[in-house]
Swiss-Prot record:
Pfam families: PBP. The keyword Cytoplasm applies. It is found in: Cytoplasm. It comes from the Bacteria. Homodimer. GO terms for cellular component: cytoplasm. Keywords: Cytoplasm. This is UPF0098 protein YbhB. Its main location: cytoplasm. The gene is ybhB. Belongs to the UPF0098 family. The lineage of its organism: Bacteria, Pseudomonadati, Pseudomonadota, Gammaproteobacteria, Enterobacterales. SUPFAM superfamilies: PEBP-like.
């Protein structure tokens, strides 16, 4: 499985348009374009996440969680997680560690460089039975048991 983006390059700096607007940052808070291919046989749905493992919480920080993307989905356009693009029926964006749904960009403590890992997971089930209030950890727990494959792009920001 392969993940690509018109907006991100693995190991490069996260562009300003994908940085949080708040907490001392003035980014545009727009979710990036993501596309994937080489999907494994038997894929019934996808989950897309953005996770910061470097957040000073002891458990990282979930910036974006999208569940129940249909098996024929291959692209999330820029702005999908920011309310700029309509979501298909049944697709949910669950609660991030900012306490709300949708995409929220990078906002590390000043002077720290963090990794932002954008991942698509191919699942062997059509849907994860969660609601919008589910945490990234709860979604991740469910993904663990149903993942056929995954692919990631890691962007950096400080």
């Amino acid at each position: 499985m392969k993940l690509i983006s018109n907006d991100l390059r693995d190991g490069d700096k996260l562009p300003h348009r994908h940085v949080f607007n708040g907490m001392g940052y003035d980014g545009d808070n727009i979710s990036p374009h993501l596309a994937w291919d080489d999907v494994p046989a038997g894929t019934k749905s996808f989950v897309v996440t953005c996770y910061d493992p470097d957040a000073p919480t002891g458990s990282g920080w979930w910036h974006w969680v999208v569940v129940n993307l249909p098996a024929d989905t291959r692209v999330l356009p820029q702005g999908f997680g920011s309310g700029l693009v309509a979501m298909p029926d049944g697709v949910l964006q669950t609660r991030t560690d900012f306490g709300k749904t949708g995409y929220d960009g990078a906002a590390p403590p000043k002077g720290e460089t963090h990794r932002y890992i954008f991942t698509v997971h191919a699942l062997d089930i059509e849907r994860i039975d969660v609601d919008e209030g589910a945490s990234g950890a709860m979604v991740g727990f469910n993904v663990h048991f149903h993942s056929l494959a995954s692919a990631s792009i890691t962007a950096m920001f400080s």
